[in-house]
Amino acid sequence: MLVIASVVLAMILWGITFVVFKYANLSFDPIAIVFIRLFISVPFLFGFALISGRMMKIRKGDFKYFFIMAFFEPFIYFLGEAFGLSMVSSTMGAVIIAIIPLLVPVAAYFLIKERLSVMNIIGLIISFGGVLMVIMASEGQFSGNAKGILLMFIAVLAAVGYTIMAKKLVHTYNGIIITAWQSTLGALLFLPLFMIFEFREVLHLTVQPESWYAVLYLGIFGSGVCFILFTAGIRELGASKANVYANLVPVVTAIVSYFMLDEA
């Protein structure tokens, strides 16, 4: 029961991140948002691991798995999500992201030979239909934000890759260490992009207070607490079952965005 509560809390906090991103985007561009949130999350995560006595040494042979996982998420995932959310509404972004739990069993079937049920296939078809309805209803026509929608789907595929790769590590390492190294490697991957494209601009920015609060939330909760809770869920429930709760994300986002962003 505690594990389920942890996963549900992770999804609630994640749902809020789609709205909070919009406040961060008032001052920062997408790459800066992602790099700064990861930069904040790394000391938070390693500090928490040290204080809680959960610090673990990574075996040399496992670094390649950590790197591949970090390449999928946060690197590719956040590139897709951050730029995608700058082009589509918070609610639409969350609805697209919500198809992740339905794609994970399909990917697991082909990549790690997990059983795929008929219900998984039916759910995937229904989910894609629902996403299409939201896109048409929100934008008037599919092509209205085609680039943003495509970027969100790239984020979805990256999250699926991350979830499959995480299955290799969750039974060896605790969620805090996995998330800490994931954020560290992700920050290193984003560092060249940040230095080349946005470092000088950030130095001369007049940042609105709400943007700093938003980036702090994204770093501590979005890239820290959420991943710790979710990784624990994968460990106890399995990838497919843990991802089922992702259906809560668009619901939370829709409610919060209605009150905070006035999105219908």
What role is predicted for each listed range?
Residues 11, 34-36, 78, 92-99, ...:
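Helix-helix packing/entry segments at the starts of transmembrane helices
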Residues 47-53, 100-125, 251-264:
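C-terminal transmembrane-helix exit sites in multi-pass transporters
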Residues 5, 34-39, 46, 50, ...:
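C-terminal-most transmembrane helix of multi-pass membrane proteins
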Residues 13, 17-18, 46-97, 133, ...:
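Specific transmembrane alpha-helical segments of multi-pass solute transporters/efflux pumps
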Residues 45, 67, 116-138, 190, ...:
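Hydrophobic transmembrane alpha-helices of multi-pass small-molecule transport proteins
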Residues 1-35, 142-168, 188-192:
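Glycine-/small-residue-enriched transmembrane alpha-helix faces in small-molecule transporters
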Residues 27-76, 103-107, 158-165, 179-198, ...:
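Transmembrane alpha-helices of multi-pass small-molecule transport proteins
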Residues 19-30, 85-87, 135-145, 196-210, ...:
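Membrane-interface helix termini and inter-helical loops of multi-pass transporters
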